[in-house]
């Protein structure tokens, strides 16, 4: 029975890839009629460069992708999908992509409102969280493709060439996929980020919307009613990074992305809360090994981030 399920899952993955190949025959990142869903194909190596992941699921149908968080490399392919349950500063790329072995996949934004509704409904229906689940949400999580996730993704992607079907059935199919994520191997991370006890994820949301202000660790701890010591411990458990390093990485990664988009160094620095351009340049070089100006002229700055 297990072998049969694996065979069916493999066939369904092949069908999903065929659909993406039809929708996106060339390299690129494209929006679909469902605003939460994007398709991508990368046919040349992209080095890992600064990025900020929003709450997202990324499913790979061909090739492999890499994300680095606090020095830890997360490499995933068609055997595992990636769940990022909260906004995180990472380095991301596809160093192995080529015309012969392109990176092909689907990127699905996690709608916080729907994820919260589902997570709380699941907790209410099934009772209290199991003891093993009662830990802070993990940062990046890689999960094995299971039957529910594979079928939900196929049912979602197959809609995309029919605008009427997409408009009418798309929101329901997205909800089905979110439910599969909350049930699957990444359930602990996803349910703790969106369900009861999601203080760290809420703190990160607060920081993301106040990035150009002088947010302190005390501000973040007060936002969720914790002492500084408890907040620091739980934050590092959830993200692997200290709150201070997280704030710095979020600002610098956002600034790096703005520079890559064509902003000047001064504009990027001010946009993420730096009052001193020289301090920004020093911290940028310390983190990335290049000054902002050097980085803006490098091949990395022009790479399309996915």
Can you describe what each PLM-predicted range is?
Residues 132-208:
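An amphipathic alpha-helical interaction segment
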Residues 2-33, 37, 46-48, 133-138, ...:
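A short, N-terminal "cap"/entry segment at the start of jelly-roll beta-barrel domains
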Residues 207-210, 258-262:
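Short helix-to-turn junction characteristic of helix-turn-helix DNA-binding domains
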Residues 29-128:
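N-terminal regulatory/effector-sensing and dimerization cores
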Residues 66, 214, 262-263:
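Residue at a beta-strand N-cap/secondary-structure junction
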Residues 197-198, 247-256, 294-306:
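Short, basic, alpha-helical segments at the C-terminal edge of helix-turn-helix-like DNA-binding modules
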Residues 176-187, 208-210, 214-250, 269-298:
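Basic/polar phosphate-binding segments, predominantly the helix-turn-helix DNA-binding elements
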